[in-house]
């Protein structure tokens, strides 16, 4: 643990639509703390509704940071988020207050606690080169390249794992070191593991599935179509993370009149449920036993489970 790691932070993890944001606001009010986005999709601008960013009413109830601050034309790494959080925690007006980290991106939580190796930044030129080759040649061809240049990591990757193959080649070219070597470098913690309150929301699966369906229908009614229309007007690379947000492909198909409204909503709901299942599985398998599991945000406050860190 770093000596500068923030003590008494609150960490709230859980699948999408599980009630994390409402719990974070309630905790911010109880502690006088501030909320920090810990979700890799909610960093992008334009998609307020489809990424379920806090509403204007939510923003009025508590201070929120690192939401929608990244243009959808950009990529944004865990390392960049780590840097932004570090800068945020150093602000004079926030020091001494309780940071409440809330979101569904497991790697962000791991990075906060020092459990993620600090990966090097890769230049846009190198990234574009290898991603262009991946698109042109395919995963098997680039896996063969990796077998020659870095046989150790190539042996650990499936020949079809295009994302990790490209990442390994990018890092090797940028730094001259294998990704395996970078992964051995211990991460630096921004949050003190021992004093942090670590919470995982794990709601009933049927309840969550219904909530996801209701929420996406509300997104549609409140302007998700306009969001996607604005995103498409930017004429972005389909490979960018923002273009892969759940609902973008389905709403785009609706706008192109290749999919009905009902089918677009149904497919988006199914994709969101599948994503929530993957998130829940990750949290169950990857977070330590010191993370306390609750079925709902309300349960956190029942029976004196929540302690004010101030």
From Swiss-Prot:
Answer whether the UniProt record assigns the keyword GTP-binding to this protein: no
Q: EC?
A: 2.5.1.75
Q: Which InterPro entries match?
A: Dimethylallyltransferase, IPT, P-loop_NTPase
Question: What cofactor does its activity depend on?
Answer: Mg(2+)
Keywords in alphabetical order: ATP-binding, Magnesium, Nucleotide-binding, Transferase, tRNA processing
Q: Where is this site: Interaction with substrate tRNA?
A: 105, 127
Which residues are involved in binding substrate?
A: 16-21
Reaction(s) catalysed by this chain's protein: adenosine(37) in tRNA + dimethylallyl diphosphate = N(6)-dimethylallyladenosine(37) in tRNA + diphosphate
Which region is the signal sequence? Answer: none
Q: Does the keyword Transmembrane apply?
A: no
Gene3D superfamilies per record: 1.10.20.140, P-loop containing nucleotide triphosphate hydrolases
Please give the biological process terms from Gene Ontology that the record holds. tRNA modification
A single Pfam family it belongs to is IPPT
Gene Ontology MF, one: ATP binding
Per UniProt, where does ATP bind?
14-21
Question: Region Interaction with substrate tRNA: which residues?
Answer: 39-42, 163-167
Q: In UniProt terms, what function does this protein have?
A: Catalyzes the transfer of a dimethylallyl group onto the adenine at position 37 in tRNAs that read codons beginning with uridine, leading to the formation of N6-(dimethylallyl)adenosine (i(6)A).
Q: Which family does it belong to?
A: Belongs to the IPP transferase family.
Which proteins does it associate with, and in what oligomeric form? Answer: Monomer.
The protein's name is: tRNA dimethylallyltransferase
């Amino acid at each position: 643990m770093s000596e500068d790691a923030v003590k008494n932070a609150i960490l709230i993890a859980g699948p999408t639509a599980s009630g994390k944001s409402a719990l974070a606001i309630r905790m911010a009010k109880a502690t006088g703390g501030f909320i920090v986005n810990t979700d890799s999709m909610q960093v992008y601008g334009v998609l307020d509704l489809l990424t379920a960013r806090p509403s204007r009413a939510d923003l009025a109830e508590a201070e929120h940071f690192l939401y929608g601050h990244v243009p959808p034309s950009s990529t944004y790494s865990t390392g960049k988020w780590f840097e932004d959080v570090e800068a945020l925690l150093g602000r004079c007006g926030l020091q001494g207050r309780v940071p409440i980290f809330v979101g569904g991106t497991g790697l962000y939580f791991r990075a906060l606690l020092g459990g993620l190796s600090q990966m090097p930044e890769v230049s846009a030129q190198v990234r574009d080169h290898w991603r262009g080759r991946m698109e042109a040649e395919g995963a098997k061809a680039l896996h063969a390249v990796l077998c020659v240049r870095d046989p150790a990591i190539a042996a650990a990757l499936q020949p079809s794992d295009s994302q990790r193959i490209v990442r390994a080649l990018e890092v090797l070219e940028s730094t001259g070191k294998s990704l395996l070597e970078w992964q051995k470098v211990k991460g630096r913690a921004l949050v003190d593991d021992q004093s942090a309150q670590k919470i995982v929301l794990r709601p009933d699966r049927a309840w969550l599935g219904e909530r996801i369906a209701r929420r996406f229908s509300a997104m549609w009614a409140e302007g998700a179509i306009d969001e996607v229309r604005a995103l498409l007007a930017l004429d972005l690379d389909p490979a960018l993370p923002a273009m892969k947000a759940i609902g973008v492909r389905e709403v785009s198909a609706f706008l192109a009149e290749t999919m009905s409204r009902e089918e677009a909503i149904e497919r988006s709901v199914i994709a969101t449920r599948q994503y929530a299942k993957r998130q829940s599985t990750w949290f169950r398998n990857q977070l330590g036993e010191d993370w306390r599991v609750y079925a709902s945000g309300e349960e956190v406050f029942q029976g004196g489970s929540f302690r004010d860190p101030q």
